[in-house]
A protein has these predicted regions:
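Conserved donor NDP-sugar-binding/catalytic core segment of glycosyltransferases
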Residues: 102, 106-137
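Short, well-formed alpha-helical segments that are part of the catalytic scaffolds
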Residues: 24-42
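A conserved acidic beta->alpha catalytic loop
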Residues: 39, 48-58
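A recurrent flexible, glycine/aromatic-enriched loop bordering the glycosyltransferase active site
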Residues: 144-162, 177-179
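Short aromatic/hydrophobic "clamp" motif used to bind/position activated sugar donors
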Residues: 95
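Donor nucleotide-sugar recognition loop
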Residues: 169-180
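Acidic helix N-cap motif at the loop->helix transition within catalytic regions
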Residues: 34, 54-63
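Glycine-rich, basic loop-to-helix element that forms the pyrophosphate-binding segment
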Residues: 73-90
Length: 180
């Protein structure tokens, strides 16, 4: 079920539903996570890291959604440690780090799957259409608004796909608590 592409003696693997796991780190996000989860194709694996000991929250997610694994941490690990925990639990080559208040458009992942053909990358990140969160700018300061691939110096953490093979198990710095 994996798609491989050959170009100049190099093979690249395309992201697919089968080789992607979406990781969502949350702390008592019942009020927003349903919108996020319903925006994700039910066939895609999902790992929820709940930074509390709220067993009812986890139970309700498991009852409502398929292809979901939930882990209670018992305490607030923060984003870095929580994402590392989720990545460690994933069995796929690619992981998407997604904030619980992010809603994917219906075609977002299919467009990313298509763009990943013939592409060697470490991180892919979609553009946001939320006016409160402006998109990337080029080094010249020009706002990016199109659908083409482009390189950036940094990505926003609300939604990003990582190729685990490019990171040698060095994902997020756990000394940086980030926010939660």
């Amino acid at each position: 079920k994996y798609s491989f592409y050959h170009n100049e003696g190099i093979f690249w693997m395309q992201i697919t539903k089968e080789n992607l796991t979406i990781i969502i780190v949350t702390i008592k996000s019942q009020n927003v996570i349903d919108n996020c989860l319903t925006s994700i194709d039910p066939e895609i694996k999902k790992i929820i890291i709940e930074n509390s000991s709220d067993e009812e929250f986890v139970k309700s997610l498991k009852e409502k959604y398929q292809n979901i694994k939930c882990y209670l941490t018992g305490k607030n690990l923060g984003m870095g440690s929580g994402n590392n925990f989720g990545i460690e639990k994933s069995s796929t080559r690619y992981v998407m780090i997604l904030n619980p208040d992010t809603i994917l458009k219906p075609d977002t992942l299919n467009r990313i799957f298509e763009k990943s053909k013939n592409l060697e990358f470490a991180i892919l990140s979609p553009l946001s259409d939320d006016k409160n969160y402006p998109n990337y700018k080029t080094k010249k300061g020009t706002q990016i608004e199109n659908n083409d691939l482009f390189e950036v110096d940094q990505v926003d953490g609300y939604a990003m796909i990582l190729d685990k093979e490019k990171f040698n198990n060095n994902f997020f710095d756990e000394e940086i608590f980030m926010y939660l």
